[in-house]
């Protein structure tokens, strides 16, 4: 297991999209569960489940097919803030991805949330990734 669970999750999703794999399994942590819930709320994934095997928890993501043009699917996912270079933003400077089509996932003092929720709550935080 890698030390950067966010980068591991992003890389797994990106590789699954390139290989057209529909279901991926990731190590379950609080951060990956929170990011998975945001992806489910925003419509980028179809399903989110948790499975336990030998006292280890796994998160199972069912990715949305890109063939459905009327539904959101992940075309690009990019890690922004890295362990070696943290990127922070206040609520006024949170970037809009593709004019609001994509989302920004932030880690705030109130938990991990999307850019829309952070602007609505008027809080900033660390920019984790861009998704569109």
UniProtKB/Swiss-Prot annotation:
Gene Ontology BP annotations? translation
Looking at the keywords, is Transferase present? no
Report keywords, A-Z.
Chloroplast, Plastid, Ribonucleoprotein, Ribosomal protein, RNA-binding, rRNA-binding
State the Gene Ontology terms under molecular function.
rRNA binding; structural constituent of ribosome
Offer one Pfam family short name for this entry.
Ribosomal_S8
Q: Which Gene3D superfamilies match?
A: 3.30.1370.30, 3.30.1490.10
Keyword Transcription regulation included in the entry's annotation: no
* Major place of residence: plastid
A Gene Ontology term for the protein's cellular component: ribosome
Its subcellular locations are:
Plastid, Chloroplast
Q: Which residues form a coiled coil?
A: none
InterPro entries found in the cross-reference section: Ribosomal_uS8, Ribosomal_uS8_CS, Ribosomal_uS8_sf
The subunit structure is: Part of the 30S ribosomal subunit.
Q: Which family does it belong to?
A: Belongs to the universal ribosomal protein uS8 family.
Role summary: One of the primary rRNA binding proteins, it binds directly to 16S rRNA central domain where it helps coordinate assembly of the platform of the 30S subunit.
Protein name, please? Small ribosomal subunit protein uS8c
Q: Could you tell me which species this protein originates from?
A: Chaetosphaeridium globosum
Report which gene this protein is encoded by.
Answer: rps8
């Amino acid at each position: 297991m890698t030390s950067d669970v966010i980068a591991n999750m992003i890389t797994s999703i990106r590789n699954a999209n390139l290989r057209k794999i529909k279901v991926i399994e990731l190590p379950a942590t609080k951060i990956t569960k929170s990011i998975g819930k945001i992806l489910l709320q925003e419509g980028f994934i179809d399903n989110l489940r948790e499975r336990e095997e030998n006292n280890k928890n796994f998160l199972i993501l069912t990715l949305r097919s890109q063939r459905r043009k009327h539904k959101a699917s992940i075309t690009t996912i990019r890690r922004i803030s890295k362990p070696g270079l943290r990127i922070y933003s206040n609520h006024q400077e949170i970037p809009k991805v593709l004019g609001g089509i994509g989302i920004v996932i932030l880690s705030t003092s109130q938990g991990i949330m999307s850019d829309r929720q952070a602007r609505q709550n008027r809080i900033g935080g660390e920019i984790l990734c861009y998704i569109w």
